[in-house]
Every structure is written in structure tokens, then in C-alpha cells.
């Protein structure tokens, strides 16, 4: 769905600006969207270089990035690999999804665009204050952490 929204936005933007559709810029945007992969389930020891090495034999890896926590510098257990062409990305998905990398079975999927609008639930509020609410990160009925879908083990609650 994100792909269709992006494509529609590109078409509207390019057609409305001058009436012509610059095919090369549209294809370039589509190529970038279809070559970026989400890699989940990474071990804490996987870094950018080892992620790149694991996917390099499928084709030219433009970028490989393990996402780390800003405060601790520790891996968050997922990352992204961007290939130069779609064929390499497709081969990497079919061959690497579910395979073991550094002792963990990884998930490999096409990367989705980051949502531009904030999520409908979560953050700020909830019955006991402190953020959260039904899907968020703190607060909730019992105070502490949690809420219906939140994180933490705030204790209390029901």
C-alpha cells in the first residue's frame, strides 16, 4: 500500500508541475523503493560490515546499516540493506529470509516507507498519565509502564 501511495504521489507531483511525466526520475524513485530491504532478528553482535558481507554475494550492496540505540550504542536487532538493482534484492529475500546469521534466524522483507503521520494510538495520555493509553509506551490503568499495548512492566494494574 505504501508503494502505491508513493507512486501516486510521484505521478501527481510530476504531472501537475509541467504536464509531462519525467520517466527517469519516476523509475529512479521506484528503483530505490524496491531495492531496500528490512532485516529483522539480528544478533547484538552484527554490525554494518558483517551485514554487508552477508548480503554482498547477491549483488552490489549500496548501503548496509544496523540500527543502534542512540543512548547505549547497542544494536536494536534490525537493520537495512540497499542493493543497486531489484534482482539482487529479490534474490536476497528468497535466499536469506529465515536463514541463520551470527546465531540468529533473520527476517528479510522489502522495507516499507516510514509513515509520515503519527500513529493513531499511543504517546501522551492514558488513564494514569505518563504517556501511553491503549497502544502507547507508559501509563495505562495501573500506572508505571504498560497500558494495553505498551512496553514496560509497571507493576500494579490489573
Curated annotation (Swiss-Prot):
Instruction: Enumerate the Gene Ontology biological process terms.
Output: cold acclimation; extracellular transport; miRNA transport; mitochondrial mRNA processing; negative regulation of termination of DNA-templated transcription; regulation of defense response to virus; response to cold; response to osmotic stress
Where in this protein does the record put region Glycine-rich (GR) required for cell-to-cell movement? 122-157
In the UniProt record, the transit peptide is located at 1-34
What positions does the domain RRM occupy?
35-113
Q: What happens when the gene is disrupted?
A: Defects in seed germination under salt or cold stress. Altered seedling growth under cold stress. Delayed growth and late flowering associated with reduced mitochondrial RNA editing efficiency, including the cis-splicing of the first intron of the NAD5 transcript. The triple mutant srbp1 srbp2 srbp3 is more susceptible to tobacco rattle virus (TRV).
SMART domains in the record: RRM
**What does the UniProt record say this protein does?**
Promotes the cis-splicing and editing of several mitochondrial RNAs (including NAD5 transcripts). Plays a role in RNA transcription or processing during stress. Binds RNAs and DNAs sequence with a preference to single-stranded nucleic acids. Displays strong affinity to poly(U) sequence. Exerts cold and freezing tolerance, probably by exhibiting an RNA chaperone activity during the cold and freezing adaptation process. Mediates cell-to-cell trafficking of RNA interference (RNAi) signals (small RNAs (sRNA), e.g.
What's the record's remark on domains? The glycine-rich (GR) domain is necessary and sufficient for cell-to-cell movement and to interefere with zucchini yellow mosaic virus (ZYMV) infection.
Q: What is this protein called?
A: Glycine-rich RNA-binding protein 2, mitochondrial
Q: Which organism is it from?
A: Arabidopsis thaliana
Q: Which gene encodes it?
A: RBG2
Amino acid at each position: 500500500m505504501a508503494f502505491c501511495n508513493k507512486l501516486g504521489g510521484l505521478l501527481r507531483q510530476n504531472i501537475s508541475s509541467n504536464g509531462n511525466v519525467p520517466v527517469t526520475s519516476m523509475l529512479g524513485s521506484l528503483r530505490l523503493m524496491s531495492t531496500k530491504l528490512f532485516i529483522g532478528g539480528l544478533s547484538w553482535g552484527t554490525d554494518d560490515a558483517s551485514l554487508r558481507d552477508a548480503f554482498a554475494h547477491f549483488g552490489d550492496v549500496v548501503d548496509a546499516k544496523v540500527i543502534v540505540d542512540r543512548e547505549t550504542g547497542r544494536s536494536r536487532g534490525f537493520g537495512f540493506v540497499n542493493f543497486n538493482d531489484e534482482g539482487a534484492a529479490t534474490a536476497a529475500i528468497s535466499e536469506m529470509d529465515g536463514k541463520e546469521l551470527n546465531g540468529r534466524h533473520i527476517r528479510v522483507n522489502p522495507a516499507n516507507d516510514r509513515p509520515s503521520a503519527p500513529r493513531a494510538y499511543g504517546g501522551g495520555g492514558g488513564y494514569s498519565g505518563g504517556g501511553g493509553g491503549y497502544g502507547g509506551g507508559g501509563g495505562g490503568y495501573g500506572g508505571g509502564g504498560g497500558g494495553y499495548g505498551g512496553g514496560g512492566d509497571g507493576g500494579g494494574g490489573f
